[in-house]
C-alpha cells in the first residue's frame, strides 16, 4: 500500500513535535556548575536551615537552604571564581575561600560555622587533612596574617604562643631559634607551603625570615614525625604564602623608615582571572643596628600561582627566595668591641603541587619540593690587641666586666681572634629535593583514612680551608605513613597513626602517634558550655646535622682509615635523636564563647641526644682508645634529659572589635645523663680559678642541671583593637632567667678560665613590650607606626649578645585596584 506524500509529511511533523516535547519534558544534563556540601558546626554536627549563597563578584549566582542533615546543593549556569557565603541563626557568618567552577563541574564545599564571633580556625598540620581546631587533640596556635602586617620578621610573634621560647642572638639579622616545650632548637620541623625548609638535621634560622608574603603560620607543639618524618621531634612550624583572591588585580605598596638607619619597602600584587589565581611580593629591609659592624639587609621575593585544570584538580606553584647579609660582631659584651665579620645567607624554597578530589570522598595530592640553602661566614681581619699566649699570637678585646643574671661577674680580656691568614671563613650548603604523595579517603563523615609516602634526596657540604675541612654528604630517605581519624557520636574525636622511616644515615625508625579529644559539654552561649578534654601520645625522630655526622666517632675513625678500631669497639654510625611525649589538656568556654581558657600538662623525654665526648672519657668510660688514630673527641648519642611543665592561655573577646589574649608556661627540665667533658668531670674540667668549688659546664650542661636557654617561666599577652579607621595592638613577652654559659673556656689573657661563670640563671629575664597602630585615611591609603621594645631592655637574648634598645618605624600603605 502506498502512503500519500501528504500523510508522510504529517508523520514527519508529528515526530518532530514529539522530539521537541521530549527535549522540554525529559531532564537532560545541563551546562551548570553544581556546588554541594554539608554545613556543620566545629564539632561536625549538621546545621539545618543554614542559608548558603554562591557569590560571584558582587552578585549572587545561586543559593540554597541546608536540609535537616545539613546538606545543600546549588546549581548555576555561571562559571568563573566563586565564594560561598554561609549564615545561620546564632552563628557567625562564614566567608569561604574563593574557588573556580566551570559549567560542567561538580564541586564539594563543607562550610563550618562558629558559634562565637571569633574567626573559624582550621588546622592542617595536626592530621594532614583540614580539620576544625575544635576537633584536634593537639596543642596548636594559628598566627593570622593580620598579626604580621606591621612586623619586619616573625620572632616576636613566635613568642605569642604557650610553650615556646624564642631566642634571637643579637639584633636584626641575628640567629633566631625556638625551644618548644624544652626541646632543642633543631628539633622543629619547618615547612613553607608544605615544603620541608630546615637544614639537613633540623637547624633553621628564624632571624632571617621576613613577614613579607606570609599569610600566617601554624605552631604545632609536640612531636609529629608520623606525618612529617625526621626533625619533627618537638614541634612543627608551617608557614603559608597568600593567594590571589580579587577578581581585579590589586597592587599594595608599603614603605617605612625608623631609627638606626632603618628603612623598608614592600610591593605585592595579586588577583584572579578565570582559572588562574596569582600573587607576587618583593621587599627590601635595611638597618645599621645599634652596634658597630652590624649592618643588616635582606631582600625577599615570593610568588604563588594556581591554575584549575578542572574545579576539582588544581595545580599550584610556590616559590620563596631570601637573600640576606649581616655583620657578625660576636658576643659584643664579652669583648667590648665588634668582630669584623659577615654572615651571608641565600635561601630558596619552591614547590609544585597537584591535587584531585574524586567523587567527593577520595582526595589525592602530589608535591615536588626543593630547598636550596647556602651560607658563607667571612672574618675580614682580626680585631683587638695581638698578644702571644703559649707561643701563639692571639687577639684580645678590651677589658670588660661580664655580669650574669645570677650575680656572678668576671673581669678580664677575652680572645676574639687568632693568628692566621685573613680574610678567612667557611661556607656550607644544605640542599634537598623531596617528593610527597598523599591519598586520603572519607569512608564516612565520621571516618577518614590517610596514606602518605615521602622521598628525600639530601646533599650537604661544609668547607673550612683554614682547618683543611672539605666535607660532603648525601642521604636518600623514605617514609611511609598510615593514619586514621574520625569521631564517635560527634563528641569523641580520635587520630591514630604510625610511620616507618628509612634514613640513609641511621637506618629504620618507627614513630607512632595517638590523640583523643572528648567534648562532654558542647559549645553554647551559656556559662561554661563548651568543654574539650584532649590527650596525645607521640614519638619523634631527628636526623643528625651535617656537622654532627662529620664529628661523629664512626666518621672520624673511617676518615682516619681505622676500620680495625671500628670493628674492635663495635662503633656504629651516629644514631637518630629520639623524643617521646605525652600531654593532656582542657579547652573550656567560660562565658558565651567570649572568654575561653586553654590549659595543659606536658611530659617530654629526649634521649639519644648528642654529647661531645673527649678522648680521655672515651677511654675511661667506654673503653675506646683513640690515641693511635689521633682523635681528641667525638660526638656520641649519650645525652638524655627530661622536660615537663604546664601551659595555659586565656582569650577574651568582649565584642567584634577587641581581642585580649594572655599565656603562661612553667617548664621543669633536667639533664639526666651526659658524658660530655664537663659532665664526666662533674664540672671541674674547666673550673674558674676565681670561683673555686663551683662546678661549671663550659660548653654543655651538667647532670642534674637545666639544659641551656630553657627558662622555667615564660609568658605573653596581646591586646588588639580593630575599628573602621583605627587598628591598634599592644603586645608583650616575658621570660625568667635561664641557664647558659659564656663559652669562654681557656680564653682569658693567660689562657685560663677566669671568664667562665656558673651556669645557673646566667641569662637575664626580660619583659619586651611593643605597640602598633594603623589609621586608614581612605580605602586606598593608610598610615602605620611600630614602637618596639618600649622598656628598652637589651638583655633579651643570650648573655653577651645585646639586643636592640627602643626602636620605632613609621610609614604608609597604598592600595591600588582590587574589588
List where the protein language model places each region.
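Extracytoplasmic beta-strand/coil segments of soluble accessory domains associated
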Residues: 155-196
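Short, acidic, small-residue-rich periplasmic hinge/interaction motif at the N-terminus
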Residues: 40, 51-53, 87-91, 102-148, ...
Amino acid at each position: 500500500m502506498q502512503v500519500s506524500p501528504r500523510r508522510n509529511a504529517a508523520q514527519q511533523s508529528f515526530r518532530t513535535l514529539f522530539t521537541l516535547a521530549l527535549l522540554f519534558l525529559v531532564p537532560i544534563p545541563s551546562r551548570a556548575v553544581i556546588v554541594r556540601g554539608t554545613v556543620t558546626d566545629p564539632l561536625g554536627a549538621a546545621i539545618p536551615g543554614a542559608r548558603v549563597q554562591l557569590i560571584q563578584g558582587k552578585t549572587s549566582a545561586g543559593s540554597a537552604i541546608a536540609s535537616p542533615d545539613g546538606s545543600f546543593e546549588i546549581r548555576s549556569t555561571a562559571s568563573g571564581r566563586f565564594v560561598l557565603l554561609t549564615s545561620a541563626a546564632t552563628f557567625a557568618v562564614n566567608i569561604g575561600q574563593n574557588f573556580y567552577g566551570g559549567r560542567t563541574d561538580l564541586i564539594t564545599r563543607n562550610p563550618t560555622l562558629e558559634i562565637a564571633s571569633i574567626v573559624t580556625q582550621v588546622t592542617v598540620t595536626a592530621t594532614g587533612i583540614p580539620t576544625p581546631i575544635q576537633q584536634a587533640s593537639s596543642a596548636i596556635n594559628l598566627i593570622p596574617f593580620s598579626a604580621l602586617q606591621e612586623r619586619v620578621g616573625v620572632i616576636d610573634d613566635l613568642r605569642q604562643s604557650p610553650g615556646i621560647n624564642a631566642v634571637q642572638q643579637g639584633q636584626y639579622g641575628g640567629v633566631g631559634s625556638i625551644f618548644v616545650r624544652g626541646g632543642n632548637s633543631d628539633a622543629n620541623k619547618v615547612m613553607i607551603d608544605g615544603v620541608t625548609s630546615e637544614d639537613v638535621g633540623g637547624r633553621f634560622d628564624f632571624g632571617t625570615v621576613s613577614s613579607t608574603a606570609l599569610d600566617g603560620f601554624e605552631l604545632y607543639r609536640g612531636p609529629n614525625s608520623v606525618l612529617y618524618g625526621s626533625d619533627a621531634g618537638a614541634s612543627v612550624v608551617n608557614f603559608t604564602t597568600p593567594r590571589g583572591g580579587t577578581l581585579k588585580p590589586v597592587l599594595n605598596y608599603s614603605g617605612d623608615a625608623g631609627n638606626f638607619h632603618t628603612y623598608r619597602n614592600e610591593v605585592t600584587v595579586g588577583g584572579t582571572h578565570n582559572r588562574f589565581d596569582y600573587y607576587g611580593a618583593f621587599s627590601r629591609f635595611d638597618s645599621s643596628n645599634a652596634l658597630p659592624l652590624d649592618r643588616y639587609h635582606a631582600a625577599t621575593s615570593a610568588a604563588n600561582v594556581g591554575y584549575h585544570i578542572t574545579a576539582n584538580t588544581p595545580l599550584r606553584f610556590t616559590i620563596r627566595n631570601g637573600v640576606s647579609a649581616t655583620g657578625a660582631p660576636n658576643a659584643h659584651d664579652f669583648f667590648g668591641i665588634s668582630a669584623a665579620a659577615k654572615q651571608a645567607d641565600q635561601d630558596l624554597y619552591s614547590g609544585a603541587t597537584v591535587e584531585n578530589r574524586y567523587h567527593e570522598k577520595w582526595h589525592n595530592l602530589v608535591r615536588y619540593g626543593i630547598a636550596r640553602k647556602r651560607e658563607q661566614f667571612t672574618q675580614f681581619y682580626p680585631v683587638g690587641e695581638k698578644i702571644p699566649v703559649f707561643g701563639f699570637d692571639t687577639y684580645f678585646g678590651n677589658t670588660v666586666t661580664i655580669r650574669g643574671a645570677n650575680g656572678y661577674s668576671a673581669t678580664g680580656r677575652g680572645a676574639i681572634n687568632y693568628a692566621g691568614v685573613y680574610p678567612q671563613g667557611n661556607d656550607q650548603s644544605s640542599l634537598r629535593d623531596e617528593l610527597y604523595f598523599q591519598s586520603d579517603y572519607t569512608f564516612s563523615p565520621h571516618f577518614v583514612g590517610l596514606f602518605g609516602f615521602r622521598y628525600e634526596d639530601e646533599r650537604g657540604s661544609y668547607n673550612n680551608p683554614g682547618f683543611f675541612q672539605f666535607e660532603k654528604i648525601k642521604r636518600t630517605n623514605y617514609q611511609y605513613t598510615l593514619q586514621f581519624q574520625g569521631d564517635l557520636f560527634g563528641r569523641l574525636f580520635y587520630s591514630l597513626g604510625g610511620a616507618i622511616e628509612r634514613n640513609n644515615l641511621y637506618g629504620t625508625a618507627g614513630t607512632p602517634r595517638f590523640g583523643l579529644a572528648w567534648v562532654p559539654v558542647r559549645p553554647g552561649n551559656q556559662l561554661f558550655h563548651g568543654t574539650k578534654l584532649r590527650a596525645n601520645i607521640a614519638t619523634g625522630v631527628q636526623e643528625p646535622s651535617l656537622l654532627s655526622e662529620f664529628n661523629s666517632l664512626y666518621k672520624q675513625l673511617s676518615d682516619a682509615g681505622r676500620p680495625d678500631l671500628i670493628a674492635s669497639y663495635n662503633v656504629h654510625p651516629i644514631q637518630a635523636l629520639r623524643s617521646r611525649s605525652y600531654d593532656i589538656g582542657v579547652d573550656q568556654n567560660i562565658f558565651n564563647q567570649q572568654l575561653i581558657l586553654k590549659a595543659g600538662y606536658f611530659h617530654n623525654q629526649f634521649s639519644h641526644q648528642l654529647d661531645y665526648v673527649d678522648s680521655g672519657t672515651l677511654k675511661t668510660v667506654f673503653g675506646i682508645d683513640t690515641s693511635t688514630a689521633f682523635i681528641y673527641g667525638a660526638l656520641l648519642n649519650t645525652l638524655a634529659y627530661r622536660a615537663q611543665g604546664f601551659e595555659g592561655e586565656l582569650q577574651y573577646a568582649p565584642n567584634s572589635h577587641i581581642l585580649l589574649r594572655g599565656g603562661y608556661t612553667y617548664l621543669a627540665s633536667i639533664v639526666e645523663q651526659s658524658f660530655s667533658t664537663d659532665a664526666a668531670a662533674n664540672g671541674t674540667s674547666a673550673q674558674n680559678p676565681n670561683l673555686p668549688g663551683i662546678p661549671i659546664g663550659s660548653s654543655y650542661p651538667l647532670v642534674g642541671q637545666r639544659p641551656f636557654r630553657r627558662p622555667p617561666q615564660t609568658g605573653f599577652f596581646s591586646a588588639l583593637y580593630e575599628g573602621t579607621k583605627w587598628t591598634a595592638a599592644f603586645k608583650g613577652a616575658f621570660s625568667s632567667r635561664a641557664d647558659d654559659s659564656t663559652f669562654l673556656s681557656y680564653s682569658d689573657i693567660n689562657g685560663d678560665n677566669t671568664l667562665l661563670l656558673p651556669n645557673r640563671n646566667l641569662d637575664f629575664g626580660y619583659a619586651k613590650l611593643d605597640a602598633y597602630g594603623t589609621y586608614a585615611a581612605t580605602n586606598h591609603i593608610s598610615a602605620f607606626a611600630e614602637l618596639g621594645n618600649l622598656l628598652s631592655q637589651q638583655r633579651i637574648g643570650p648573655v653577651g649578645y645585646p639586643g636592640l634598645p627602643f626602636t620605632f618605624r613609621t610609614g604608609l600603605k597604598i592600595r591600588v585596584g582590587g574589588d
